A protein has these predicted regions:
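Conserved acidic carboxylate
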Residues: 7
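Acidic, metal-coordinating helix/loop segments flanking the phosphotransfer/catalytic sites
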Residues: 29-47
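C-terminal output helix
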Residues: 84, 102-111
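Acidic catalytic/metal-coordinating carboxylates
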Residues: 32, 58-61
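Short amphipathic alpha-helix used as the core "switch/output" element in two-component signaling
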Residues: 60-72
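Alpha4 helix (beta4-alpha4-beta5 surface) of REC/receiver domains from two-component response regulators
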Residues: 61, 81-96
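Two-component/phosphorelay signaling modules centered on CheY-like receiver
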Residues: 10-28
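Active-site residues of response regulator receiver
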Residues: 51, 78
């Protein structure tokens, strides 16, 4: 499974990429919407895991675009915990809306990674 991770916080980006790689996923990282759009134009992905508070815009715009143009599974990973924000995320096309700090088990389930794939 090839996953595009869009996250502006370096440590979070690195941890997500490392844990997903240990589960057998191929990960590509982007630190903002501009980088993510470039990656989406260059290669195909099975899923998008994106923060919503990005330095160059709202990650929900990226989610909506990726769903429309590429049909990707989209998972929000965000600090936006309010119910209204969750509703906005689901309307924009998020298949799953996970809040930070991320429960990696929930992320694996959202991506459909079988439990026997270990991140340890």
């Amino acid at each position: 499974m090839r996953i595009l991770i869009v996250e502006d916080h370096c440590d979070t980006r690195t941890v997500l990429a490392t844990l997903l790689s240990r589960c057998g996923c191929q990960t590509v990282i982007a630190k903002n919407i501009k980088d993510a759009r470039s990656q989406l134009a260059e290669m195909s992905f099975d899923a998008l895991v994106s923060d919503l508070n990005l330095p160059d815009g709202d990650g929900l715009d990226l989610v909506a675009e990726a769903k429309r143009l590429h049909g990707l599974k989209a998972i929000a990973v965000t600090g936006r915990t309010e119910a209204v924000e969750r509703e906005r995320g689901l309307r924009a096309g998020c298949d799953f809306y996970l809040t930070k700090p991320v429960d990696f088990h929930q992320l694996r389930c959202a991506l459909g990674i079988p439990p026997h794939h270990s991140a340890a």
